[in-house]
């Protein structure tokens, strides 16, 4: 990537968008746009060594750490904002020294907590560990001015520093396990505030008006709590709770607001006592190739500095952010992408699409923003409600918890085959045909799954046979021939097995296309009987030290028959066969009447709204995930592209170091440990690759997680598990309730 030089360089010219006609959506995309300017730090070659920075008046202080073989160093780059001056101070430390909480005062002096330790383990019976802490002050050149020892209350008591801050009046505050200590600029102790037994000295935030806040986690409310604190007495008052999920934010002092809050969506303003946060900057609307901004320092109501980790380069970058006047944001047609949480691959492609597409712009509507500390499902519920009401975003990132069959039966999604067939750069034959078929409905493709994993059950071939698929009767026959005490699965409860059974074999009991349900069938009654043998919960006493010492050999030693397995690449199969089991295995699947108990878990699942007004634009975005550029970038999970999987197979079979498809030198090394014994695992063979490919191509059932369905079955099956009703009685009740549920949601 081209390096950009200058104090404030790399100005990103934003081609940002709005819908025509002045809609609320287009207005929103314009209101929260900032441009980014990279702060050039020529003195630092490896920007990823930067850890923090401070702004004092017109000067930036950038702090970083380098680790050498025999020593380590801390560097401080001092840079005027106008570029007129720039210099660097390097502080060399020994390997047993560490500088923490490094900061700078208004005069340019540096303060830190210096940790020095000594270790001698040459004599195991006389292990020596000594550790000392100091409050250290240095001048602008890094010369020591004074050093104050920091200790606990007792001679042998453990000591550690929670944080060190310079207060607005110049005093230094240090919080430790014993409370708060205030020092003057010469290192003299001014006051000690003892921490009460029922109180916790959390982090300290100084607002621009001088107010000091203490932030700590409230176990009573399961939220982060802000309290005003009297620094002289340590007394706290006036509790405040940020709306939403408080843990998703980082907290910084603001100018136009008491606090600036940063999430992976953007930057928000918050005034103490407000019931809502105010969005200031949206990362996607601003074309920011990063998921977070760290260490925000505001300069004005419309400017702030912050550090990012660039998603494209992986580099740490110090940026200046400046609000863009909405009238200067370029108009484009708006596409809405809905999701319940967003992955980095989608996020990056949205940013790239928005930068390069001259006609369309994507706005993300992430429903996870509605979740709260009290209820993490609010967003998913709201998304489902919107979809059921007919409001479907132009592009939707599906979640396995959503009732996709219900949506398809209502005609909410667009058939994608027509777009693929007309696309001159795409050929359906280049992809796993069974995966495409799995997401068809009546010959139409409504879901695009460009990457996936396989959820299955594995067992020794000598136990379960060589062919995939089996029934509960066949599993019971195998178990009947095993010694008493043999487990079917390791550490699985009745509830977890119920979930697995619904996720991996529910297709045999519901047909969403016809609405037919079979929960009063003999097959389902047998499933209930199978589930009853699993414990409601395990006693921790069942898992003593001996159990955990032998855990890695449970399958090898035939103490456990089966392993629930996520097959996400050739290495995972190789590890499972040659490590977990140590012999030939069969990917058997969960027992099911139709012998089809393995499922496809989409790593990404995209759909297009049937009523979208911008289908051409939606497809322009979606097609990228079928292109070689994306398919060849997949390293976790299975790509849809057969050619990419062939390359992955070739790499997995290599025994010598090689350069992978990402340009990295890779040396094969895979091991399995049984206790302290290391077992070297040979690379996968061509025959094993063929076995894996044949299995993958045989799987044609999508993985689902229908919480409503699981809840119905769990509630109604409980009387059977407790002995109050027989299996047939509860099966009839479940059949009735599920049939109503299906009828209402088709």
Protein language model annotation of sequence segments:
Residues 116, 160-162, 384-385, 393-394, ...:
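A structural signal for short loop-to-beta-strand junctions that line the ligand-binding cleft
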Residues 417-430, 507-528, 579, 589-599, ...:
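Short, solvent-exposed loop/beta-turn-alpha elements that line the ligand-binding surface or hinge
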Residues 407-411, 417, 432-473, 491-515, ...:
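Periplasmic solute-binding protein
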Residues 600, 662-738:
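C-terminal capping/gating helix-and-loop segments adjacent to ligand/active sites or protein-protein/ligand interfaces
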Residues 20-70, 75-79, 83, 116-120, ...:
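Conserved N-terminal structural module of periplasmic/extracytoplasmic solute-binding proteins
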Residues 577-654, 697-698:
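Extracytoplasmic/periplasmic substrate-recognition and gating elements
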Residues 361-431, 440, 552-562, 578-579:
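Extracytoplasmic "Venus flytrap"/periplasmic binding protein-like
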Residues 514-548, 575, 585-590:
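Glycine-centered hinge/linker elements that transmit conformational signals in sensory
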């Amino acid at each position: 990537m081209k390096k950009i030089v200058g104090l404030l360089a790399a100005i990103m010219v934003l081609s940002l968008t709005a819908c025509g006609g002045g809609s609320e959506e287009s207005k929103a995309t314009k209101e929260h746009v900032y441009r980014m300017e990279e702060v050039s730090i020529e003195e630092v070659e490896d920007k990823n060594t930067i850890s923090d920075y401070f702004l004092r008046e017109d000067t930036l202080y950038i702090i970083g750490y380098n680790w050498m073989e025999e020593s380590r160093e801390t560097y401080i780059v001092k840079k005027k904002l106008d570029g007129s001056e720039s210099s660097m101070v390097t502080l060399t430390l020994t390997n047993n020294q560490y500088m923490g909480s490094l900061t700078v005062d208004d005069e340019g002096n540096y303060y830190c907590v210096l940790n020095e330790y000594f270790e001698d383990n040459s004599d195991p019976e006389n292990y020596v560990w000594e550790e000392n802490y100091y409050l250290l002050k240095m001048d602008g050149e890094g010369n020591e001015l004074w050093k104050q020892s920091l200790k606990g209350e007792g001679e042998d008591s453990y000591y550690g520093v929670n944080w060190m801050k310079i207060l607005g009046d110049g005093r230094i505050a240090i919080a430790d396990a014993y409370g708060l200590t205030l020092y003057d600029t010469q290192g003299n102790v001014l006051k000690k505030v003892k921490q009460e037994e029922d109180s916790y000295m959390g982090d300290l935030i100084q607002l621009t008006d001088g107010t000091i806040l203490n932030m700590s986690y409230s176990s009573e409310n399961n939220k982060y709590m802000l309290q005003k604190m009297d620094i002289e007495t340590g007394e706290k008052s006036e509790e405040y709770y940020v709306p939403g999920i408080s843990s998703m934010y980082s907290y910084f002092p603001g100018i136009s607001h008491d606090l600036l809050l940063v999430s992976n969506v953007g930057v928000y303003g918050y005034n103490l006592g407000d019931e809502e946060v105010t969005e200031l900057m949206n990362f996607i609307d601003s074309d920011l190739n990063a998921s977070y901004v760290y260490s925000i320092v505001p300069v004005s109501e419309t400017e702030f500095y912050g550090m990012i980790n660039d998603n494209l380069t992986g580099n740490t970058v110090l940026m200046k952010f400046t609000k863009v006047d909405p009238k200067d944001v370029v108009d484009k047609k708006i596409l809405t992408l809905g999701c319940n949480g967003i992955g980095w691959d989608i996020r990056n492609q949205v940013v790239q699409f928005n930068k390069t597409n001259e006609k369309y712009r994507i706005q993300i509507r992430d429903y996870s923003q509605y979740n709260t500390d009290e209820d993490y499902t609010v967003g998913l519920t709201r998304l489902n409600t919107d979809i059921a009401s007919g409001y479907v975003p132009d592009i939707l990132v599906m979640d396995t918890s959503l009732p996709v069959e219900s949506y398809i039966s209502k005609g909410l999604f667009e058939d994608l085959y027509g777009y693929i067939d007309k696309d001159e750069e795409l050929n359906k034959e280049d992809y796993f045909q069974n995966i495409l078929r799995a997401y068809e409905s009546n010959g139409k493709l409504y879901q695009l799954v460009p990457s996936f994993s396989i959820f299955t059950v594995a067992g020794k071939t000598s136990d379960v046979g060589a062919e995939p698929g089996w029934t509960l009767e066949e599993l019971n026959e195998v178990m009947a021939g095993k010694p008493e005490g043999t487990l079917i699965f390791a550490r699985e409860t009745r509830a977890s097995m119920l979930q697995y059974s619904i996720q991996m074999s529910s297709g045999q009991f519901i047909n969403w296309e016809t609405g037919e349900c079979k929960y009063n069938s003999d097959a389902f009654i047998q499933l209930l009987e199978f589930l009853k043998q699993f414990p409601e919960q395990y006693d921790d006493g069942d898992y003593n030290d001996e159990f955990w010492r032998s855990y890695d050999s449970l399958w090898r030693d035939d103490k456990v028959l089966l392993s629930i397995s996520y097959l996400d690449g050739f290495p995972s199969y190789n590890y499972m066969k040659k490590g977990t089991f140590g012999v030939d295995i069969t990917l058997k699947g969960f027992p099911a009447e139709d012998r089809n108990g393995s499922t496809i878990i989409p790593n990404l699942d995209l759909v297009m709204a049937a009523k979208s007004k911008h289908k051409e634009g939606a497809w322009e975005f979606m097609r990228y995930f079928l292109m070689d550029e994306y398919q060849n970038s997949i390293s976790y999970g299975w790509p849809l592209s057969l050619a990419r999987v062939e390359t992955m197979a070739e790499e997995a079979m290599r025994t010598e170091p090689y350069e992978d498809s990402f340009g990295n030198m890779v040396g094969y090394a895979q091991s399995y440990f049984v206790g302290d014994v290391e077992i070297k695992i040979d690379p996968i063979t061509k025959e094993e690759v063929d076995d894996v490919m044949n299995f993958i191509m045989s799987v044609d059932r999508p993985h689902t997680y229908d919480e409503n369905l699981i809840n119905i079955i769990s509630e109604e099956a409980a009387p059977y598990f407790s002995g109050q009703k027989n299996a047939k009685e509860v099966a009839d009740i479940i059949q009735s309730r599920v049939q109503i549920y299906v009828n209402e949601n088709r």
